[in-house]
């Protein structure tokens, strides 16, 4: 009988002797050929391991159980002769006088709810043409990120998506969708192509535990930040979660459709914790993959009951292997790390270096949340804001400094930001313009490390926040002219800041969740994109579209060098106005040789001086597409509209 306590396991797993004896560097998981399949499991604390074979992903009886052979460095292995494609399996592990069943932590396909792993020949299940899919070549100056949940994207009956595909991966692959199928107003992929975004960031798409795939989804909803399997797509987004090959094929169809539209796919990855403590990793090697307090209990820096021990060698390897797998097998264009502050800097830098070795890997984006969800037992360098200088310069962070300066704090719904009239925020607005490269508060290596944003899936939508600051009982569905102007100004600021612009899907059509600040398990109806609002607020959509297009013609706003922020010249204006210029060299491909921008958060017109020369008005705070035509030429001074961002270019 094993009498080790959790504290004993901690001491063992963190010992040099354990690492030396049990750090395995060979292949793990399934190695399939038509002639036979090799299964490999890393389980150094097990005394015996058996594989159990099934014909189905759920139900039915075990058709055979075979022992695995113990190899060195904690490895167990077995060879299954014959073509095993479509076979489901689990492991039974024996240790400490007891036994338990577990799925394969390295599995790449699974049955319903991931309870049984699946052996799959991907050459048979990949969608037609997958070998010809490739990451789109997106210039740095074109980068912008639109964040969405797979279900939210197409759940609205008005989306024009066929009913069987609503809320599914395949909704991204349906071409030509329009509002109520009217043939006029674009929705879904059709809409994205018109809007001009270059990347879609998908909220978690690997298998998560909070939605029961075997039941109707009508009343079930979750964002998916509760991973159950890290290398398998979520089954509830497929048209048939009971067949392991379907989720794999349809996830790839989604990615291929976005790539064909010239849109990159960024995957929101949640390696920082798992769904509950009775999970696939803890069943394989109890306690090893999760960080522990001094008494051996699980650390809870995620706020979800456990946190991933990225500093332990085989845990680090697991994380890196998984990310590389998604990059290679699914052609993912970028990775957004949830609670990145729970990973150690060394692991993140090693991962960046490994991604860079892939074909085209240096173009794969990598950024994350530089904070934690609670107190962590990680006592080495965390991948957070305080250690930004230690992170590779191509690992970016969400800049909550920029977010809070523009719209106000996210933890106090009524706290205003610059766009709502908080005059003292103007200094942070100036810092945000230069991507904080000229501020001691947050000195990144370069602007490329800063993700500039005002809304994401967490907290209030931008629209709800703007209304909540002004009204005790907002009418979220109303057309509010002040909030519209503030929304345009917010977009006008972060889309002219240096760095990577990012926003929550629907921000551009005043998305509302009726004041719900944390809708992770609210109703599908509350969370879904309301495509009728895209038509109702079409002028706001067009404003975003114009700014997205305009930004591309000022490549220096997306520059990755430190010289660009230093080139910005700020004007001395009456407070709380902010004005600045890039007086020359706006980057290769720029349509104008100089850029001049003003932000006016007041409700009054303001007259300001212009730099010397003739300036073309590109955006006046109401229309952001003036640059597309013959707009006004101004010199000497100009009038800023109330609550506006005004942009000029010098020919």
PLM ranges: what are they?
Residues 43, 85-87, 630-651:
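C-terminal beta-strand-rich structural cap/linker in extracellular carbohydrate-active enzymes
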Residues 151-330, 339-359, 365, 376-377:
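Substrate-binding/active-site clefts of carbohydrate-active enzymes
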């Amino acid at each position: 009988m094993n009498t080790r306590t959790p504290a004993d396991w901690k001491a063992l797993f963190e010992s040099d002797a354990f690492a030396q004896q049990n750090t395995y560097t060979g292949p793990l998981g399934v190695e399939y050929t038509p002639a036979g399949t090799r299964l490999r499991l890393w389980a150094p604390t097990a005394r015996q391991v058996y594989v159990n074979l099934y014909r189905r992903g759920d139900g039915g009886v075990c058709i055979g159980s075979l022992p695995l052979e113990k190899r060195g460095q904690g490895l167990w292995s077995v060879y299954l002769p014959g073509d095993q494609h479509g076979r489901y399996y689990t492991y039974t592990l024996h240790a400490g006088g007891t036994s338990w069943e577990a799925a394969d932590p390295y599995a790449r396909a699974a049955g319903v709810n991931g309870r049984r792993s699946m052996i799959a020949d991907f050459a048979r299940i990949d969608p037609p043409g997958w070998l010809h899919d490739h990451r789109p070549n997106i210039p740095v100056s074109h980068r912008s990120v639109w964040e969405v949940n797979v279900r939210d994207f197409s759940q609205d009956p008005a989306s024009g998506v066929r009913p069987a595909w609503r809320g599914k991966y395949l909704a991204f692959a349906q071409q030509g969708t329009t509002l109520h199928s009217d043939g006029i107003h674009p929705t879904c992929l059709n809409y994205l192509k018109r809007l001009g975004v270059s990347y879609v960031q998908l909220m978690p798409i690997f298998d998560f535990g909070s939605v029961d795939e075997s039941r109707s989804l009508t009343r079930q909803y979750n964002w998916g930040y509760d991973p159950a399997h890290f290398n398998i797509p979520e089954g509830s987004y497929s048209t048939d979660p009971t067949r392991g090959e379907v989720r794999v094929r349809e996830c790839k169809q989604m990615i291929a459709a976005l790539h064909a539209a010239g849109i990159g796919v960024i995957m929101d990855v949640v390696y920082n914790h798992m769904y509950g403590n009775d999970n696939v990793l803890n069943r394989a090697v109890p306690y090893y993959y999760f960080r522990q307090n001094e008494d051996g209990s699980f650390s809870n820096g995620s706020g979800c009951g456990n946190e991933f021990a990225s500093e332990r060698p085989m845990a680090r390897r697991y994380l890196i292997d998984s990310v590389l797998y998604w990059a290679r097998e699914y052609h993912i264009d970028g990775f957004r790390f949830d609670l990145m502050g729970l990973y150690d800097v060394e692991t993140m830098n090693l991962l960046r270096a490994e991604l860079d070795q892939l074909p085209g890997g240096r173009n794969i984006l990598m950024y994350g949340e530089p904070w934690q969800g609670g107190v962590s037992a990680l006592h080495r360098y965390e991948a957070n804001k305080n250690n930004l200088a230690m992170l590779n310069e191509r690992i970016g962070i969400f800049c909550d400094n920029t977010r809070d300066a523009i719209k106000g704090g996210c933890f106090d719904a009524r706290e205003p930001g610059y766009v709502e009239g908080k005059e003292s925020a103007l200094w942070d607005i100036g810092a945000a313009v230069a991507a904080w490269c000229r501020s001691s508060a947050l000195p990144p290596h370069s602007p490329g490390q800063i993700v500039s944003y005002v809304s994401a899936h967490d907290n209030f939508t931008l629209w709800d926040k703007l209304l909540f600051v002004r009204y005790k009982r907002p009418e979220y569905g109303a057309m509010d002219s002040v909030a519209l102007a503030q929304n345009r100004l917010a977009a006008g600021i972060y889309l002219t800041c240096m760095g990577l612009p990012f926003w929550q899907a629907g921000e551009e059509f005043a998305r509302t969740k009726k004041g719900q600040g944390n809708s992770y398990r609210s109703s599908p109806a509350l969370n879904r994109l309301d495509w009728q609002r895209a038509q109702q607020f079409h002028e706001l959509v067009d404003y975003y579209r114009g700014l997205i297009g305009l930004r591309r013609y000022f490549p220096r706003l997306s520059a990755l060098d430190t010289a660009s922020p230093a080139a910005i010249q700020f004007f001395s204006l009456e407070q709380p106005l902010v004005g600045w210029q890039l007086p020359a060299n706006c980057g290769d491909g720029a349509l104008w040789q100089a850029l001049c921008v003003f932000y006016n958060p007041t409700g009054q017109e303001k007259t300001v001086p212009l730099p010397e020369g003739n300036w073309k008005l590109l955006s006046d705070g109401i229309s952001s597409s003036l640059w597309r035509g013959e707009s006004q030429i101004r010199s000497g001074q100009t009038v800023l509209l109330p609550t506006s961002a005004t942009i000029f270019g010098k020919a």
